[in-house]
């Protein structure tokens, strides 16, 4: 009954029979699924295999005339039905470490956002702009946009933290936060006690179906361990379906995985390098990124320096999965989490937009190499340390970055601040305070409400006259695609190579 017979007949279709109980056909990278269960039809495994062959040759709406064994009726008609995904079946979760990033996530079409407050989250040092007093406003803004809000309480919790943890959970519940992301059983248990939905962090390192089944008593969504490959993820997904593993809300547990962003050298966490070197615990949200530095390796006995191919021997490249999003979906991933709460709003907007487009293309059946190439180029423009596939496709060893900091192909250079928006003509006025701008420049506008807005400067006006170059100290007006606010920040986007060349001069 558990034997799996699979045949890959072409590059666009995968046909699988789970003999003798169930049969699945997936076409066009998973956008279509046909299923027949033997228990519902009464056919033997042999007959089910004939159905399997017939399905291969069939199209939606067609009927198969079957002639099973003599012990069964002479024939049966089975209509082929197809199941297609909708955008609501998936969730793009955006990282939010500032009000600018929150606005950028909402404008980019994120389905959910995650953020931290106070000291009990894994970005307490690098992205701690929110406090407990902000919870109600964040929940309200997200609700108005139809976006779910998730609060991270995912550090190691000590006895002295229990009172603060409960205070934060109570405040989240009262504010209407959608869920708490937790890694400690104390947090999970208290969330369940007060009726606050909880999701499980990758810090738990859940890597098998039995562990997921155990934790399902607490949570409806589980982030699996980052070191799993997609075959392992699929086995866990199949177990959820077959065993009907449900969370406290009564729904099948959903699988969440990181799809983009920085990877820790310790994979799913529990790193003590920063604590050992600088007394700053990564597991308490205070990682000092010691692993990102360049190192030389010496033999302690002889003091001979060993030759290594890369000085950044503990700094992984960033994860990027957009080119195999179809495989992620086929493995059962339903919530796609983007790392980057310490990143700027332009990063959040660009990454969310690309992955949202990728999922929509998968659903539409228009996912293509050309689109992937376009997304890749756009993703390269924002913060990254170079990209690799992570461990999802079976790679056993990591890939290491070649530089300290970002390898983004574009860098932002501060130019000025917003003064006024003329809504009747869609024009914004800015005061140029630093770097000059010129016609043809790619500009970035950021702000707590504006988020991140890109615009190409096609025409610039100074005192109503068109100009090609706008110098420091000058008020300039130009068309923008949306409203800007006073004190929004204006940047000029510069190719990274151009900026490096100027610094060498």
Where are these regions (language model features)?
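Short hydrophobic targeting helices and cationic amphipathic motifs
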Residues: 22-23, 44, 50, 57, ...
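Conserved non-cysteine loop/helix-boundary elements of the Radical SAM core domain that shape
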Residues: 125-129
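Short, glycine/polar-rich helix-capping loops at beta-to-alpha or helix-loop-helix junctions
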Residues: 207-212
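Intrinsically disordered, low-complexity segments enriched in small polar residues
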Residues: 2, 6-13, 29-47, 58-62
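Surface-exposed amphipathic alpha-helical tracts and adjacent flexible/coil segments at the periphery
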Residues: 83-108, 112-124, 136-139, 143-155, ...
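Glycine/small-residue-rich interface belts in oligomeric ring/scaffold proteins
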Residues: 130-134
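Residue-level detector of intrinsically disordered terminal segments
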Residues: 16, 47, 55, 77-82
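Well-ordered mid-protein domain cores that form the structural environment of catalytic cofactors
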Residues: 165-201
């Amino acid at each position: 009954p558990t034997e799996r017979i699979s045949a890959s007949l072409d590059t666009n279709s995968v046909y699988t029979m789970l003999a003798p109980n169930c049969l699945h056909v997936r076409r066009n990278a998973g956008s279509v699924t046909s299923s027949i269960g033997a228990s519902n039809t009464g056919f033997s495994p042999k007959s089910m295999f004939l159905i399997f062959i017939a399905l291969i040759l069939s199209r939606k709406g067609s009927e198969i005339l079957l002639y099973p064994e003599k012990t069964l009726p002479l024939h049966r008609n089975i209509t082929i039905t197809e199941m297609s995904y909708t955008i609501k079946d998936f969730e793009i979760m955006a990282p939010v470490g500032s009000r600018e990033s929150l606005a950028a996530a909402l404008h980019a079409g994120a389905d959910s956002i995650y953020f931290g407050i106070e000291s009990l989250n894994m970005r307490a040092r690098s992205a701690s702009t929110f406090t407990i007093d902000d919870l109600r406003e964040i929940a309200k803004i997200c609700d108005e946009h139809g976006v779910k809000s998730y609060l991270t309480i995912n550090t190691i919790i000590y006895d002295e933290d229990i009172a603060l943890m409960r205070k934060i959970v109570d405040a989240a519940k009262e504010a209407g936060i959608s869920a708490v992301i937790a890694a400690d059983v104390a947090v999970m248990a208290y969330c369940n006690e007060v009726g606050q939905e909880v999701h499980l962090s990758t810090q738990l390192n859940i890597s098998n179906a039995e562990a997921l089944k155990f934790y399902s008593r607490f949570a409806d969504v589980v982030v699996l361990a980052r070191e799993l490959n997609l075959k392992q993820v699929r086995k866990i997904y199949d177990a959820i379906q077959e065993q009907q593993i449900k969370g406290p809300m009564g729904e099948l547990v959903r699988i969440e995985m990181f799809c983009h962003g920085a990877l820790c050298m310790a994979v799913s966490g529990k790193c003590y390098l920063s604590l050992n070197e600088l007394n700053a615990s990564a597991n308490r949200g205070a990682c000092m990124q010691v692993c990102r530095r360049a190192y030389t390796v010496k033999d302690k006995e002889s003091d001979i320096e060993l030759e290594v191919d890369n000085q950044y021997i503990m700094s992984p490249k960033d994860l990027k999965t957009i080119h195999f999003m179809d495989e992620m979906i086929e493995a059962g991933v339903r919530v796609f989490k983007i790392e980057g709460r310490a990143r700027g709003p332009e990063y959040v907007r660009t990454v969310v937009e690309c992955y949202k487009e990728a999922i929509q293309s998968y659903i539409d059946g228009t996912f293509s190499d050309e689109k992937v190439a376009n997304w890749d180029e756009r993703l390269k423009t924002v913060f990254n340390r170079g990209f690799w596939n992570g461990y999802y496709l079976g790679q056993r060893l990591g890939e290491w970055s070649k530089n300290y900091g970002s390898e983004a192909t574009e860098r932002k250079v501060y130019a000025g601040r917003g003064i006024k928006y003329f809504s009747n003509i869609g024009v914004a006025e800015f005061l140029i305070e630093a770097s000059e701008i010129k016609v043809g420049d790619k500009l970035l506008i950021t702000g707590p409400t504006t988020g991140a807005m890109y615009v190409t400067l096609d025409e610039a006006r100074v005192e109503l006259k068109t100009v090609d170059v706008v110098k420091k100290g000058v008020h300039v007006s130009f068309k923008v695609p949306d409203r800007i606010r006073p004190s929004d920040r204006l940047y000029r986007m510069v190719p990274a190579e151009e900026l490096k060349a100027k610094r060498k001069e």
